UniProtKB/Swiss-Prot annotation:
InterPro entries in the cross-refs: Elp3/MiaA/NifB-like_rSAM, Methylthiotransferase, Methylthiotransferase_CS, Methylthiotransferase_N, Methylthiotransferase_N_sf, NA-bd_OB-fold, Ribosomal_uS12_MeSTrfase_RimO, rSAM
Annotated [4Fe-4S] cluster 1 binding sites: C13, C49, C78
EC number: 2.8.4.4
The organism of origin for this protein: Acinetobacter baylyi (strain ATCC 33305 / BD413 / ADP1)
The protein's role, per its UniProt record: Catalyzes the methylthiolation of an aspartic acid residue of ribosomal protein uS12.
UniProt remark on cofactor binding: Binds 2 [4Fe-4S] clusters. One cluster is coordinated with 3 cysteines and an exchangeable S-adenosyl-L-methionine.
Primary residence: cytoplasm
Protein name: Ribosomal protein uS12 methylthiotransferase RimO
Length: 447
């Protein structure tokens, strides 16, 4: 008897990607095969995103394509919170579940495509680290679900609930399993990484027979013992983050912080109801860089938030010039269905939003280009992601570059028979532009 096949479409952020990996791992553990196309699937699971309107539309389109090509579709993920919207467009989907509803998805799969009988998991082995949708050399490590904050532009808590931290022993064991599987870089993700453990009152757990608190610093310290790259994402600048900078300065974890500042005007931050908005971030960034001169800071910002005046925007630009952040993303404000910011007065016109976005990006491009120019002549360690098809070039990243959202280091004139994805290289930086670096190979690192 052939094993049933399940097709899978994964949309959205890295946190949703981890949800997809978990569902796929459970499917494979139970003996289901993963179909490579719609035609070969007994049903299709679509893991959706519902954060902004464009993501909602992409999710609805993906559901429609799966319905058209296959006809038997289970919908999960953040958009699943709005079942009425999904069924209004696609009334014949088999089942709709919410975000991180792993058991609900599996029950729906069991209902419509029963698991194969007499499946022996010891014969059809699933790798210890589970099924991964990322390249073999890096992986996302989700440490918690949900968020306790109620930012006015965000509906994540209504989709994923309040903060629920994973036991630290479970987090560390997963990270160790990833290392054993050959992963060179772990990217720590959640909705609010630096709040990790608050909901458990920093409960004591165990890993390798040693007591470890379910706490941001303690987790980072333990991850730093693994001897692989550890990159922190979605870190809010609470006061206790300062201690983690010491771990970066000691080389225990990558000196890289992804902090979503979102704005710099105190008035706009108050309207956004941002956590930690009262902290003097410029002074703290200065102290962080004194402690750890190699620190790279990435952030995201929103321009055109309801009520944003030209004065507020100028405060943001001046803050940006002083902060000298390394990596920055910017978005124009987009109303999200269900977000309380929609009810704020004085919405900014699309024309003004776009004009401010362009001014913002021009300022940041100059900052980014200047900071990257300083890298020329430096020796850096980079991790190879891929090789270019037509040229002897390795597409790599340094500690300063997260996959997909930051720049690359292009290592030129390599021998493709010697350089492979997942290898660490020692390189010399030879050139730079606004976002990327160019380098020549010094040596392939063996450890």
């Amino acid at each position: 008897m052939k094993s049933p096949k399940v097709g899978f479409v994964s949309l959205g952020c890295p946190k949703a990607l981890v949800d997809s990996e978990r569902i796929l791992t459970q499917l494979r553990t139970e003996g289901y095969q993963v179909a490579s196309d719609y035609d070969g699937a007994d049903l299709v699971v679509v893991n959706t995103c519902g954060f902004i309107e464009s993501a909602v539309q992409e999710s609805l389109d993906a559901i429609g394509e799966a319905m058209s090509e296959n006809g038997r579709v289970i919908v999960t993920g953040c958009l699943g919170k709005d079942e009425d919207k999904i069924r209004q467009m696609h009334p014949n989907v088999l089942k709709v579940t919410g975000a991180a509803a792993y058991q609900d998805v599996m029950e729906a799969v069991h209902e419509y495509v029963p698991a194969p009988p007499r499946h022996n998991p010891f014969v059809d082995l699933v790798p210890e680290q589970g099924i991964r949708l990322t390249p073999k050399h890096y992986a996302y490590l989700k440490i918690s679900e949900g968020c306790n904050h109620r930012c006015t532009f965000c509906i994540i808590p209504s989709m994923r609930g309040d903060l629920v931290s994973r036991p630290v022993g479970s987090v560390l064991e997963e990270a160790a399993a990833l290392k054993r599987a050959g992963v060179k870089e772990v990217l720590v993700i959640s909705q609010d990484t630096s709040a990790y453990g608050v909901d458990t009152k920093y409960k004591l757990d165990f890993w390798n027979g040693q007591p470890v608190k379910t706490k941001f610093y303690d987790m980072c310290e333990a991850l730093g013992q693994l001897g692989i790259w550890v990159r922190l994402h979605y870190v809010y600048p609470y006061p206790h983050v300062d201690a983690v900078i010491d771990l970066m300065a000691q080389g225990k974890i990558l000196p890289y912080l992804d902090i979503p500042f979102q704005h710099a005007s105190p008035r706009i931050l108050k309207l956004m109801k941002r956590p930690a908005h009262s902290e003097n971030t410029l002074d703290r960034i200065k102290v962080w860089r004194e402690k750890c001169p190699n620190l790279v800071i990435r952030s995201t910002f929103v321009v055109g938030f309801p009520g944003e005046t030209e004065e507020d925007f100028q405060i943001l630009l001046e803050w940006l010039k002083e902060a000298q952040l390394d990596r920055v993303g910017c978005f124009t404000y987009s109303p999200v269905e269900g977000a309380t910011a929609n009810d704020l007065p004085d919405h900014v016109s699309e024309e003004v939003k776009q004009e401010r976005y362009e001014r913002f990006m021009q300022v940041q491009q100059e900052i980014s280009a200047a900071r990257l120019q300083k890298r020329i002549g430096q020796t850096m360690t980079v991790l190879v992601d891929s090789l270019e098809d037509e040229y002897p070039v390795a597409v790599a990243r340094s500690y300063a570059d997260a996959p997909e959202i930051d720049g690359n280091v292009f290592v030129e004139d390599i021998d493709k028979s010697l350089v492979q994805p997942g290898q660490l290289l020692e390189v010399e930086i030879t050139d730079a532009d606004e976002y990327d670096l160019f380098a020549k190979l010094i040596q392939i690192k063996t450890a």
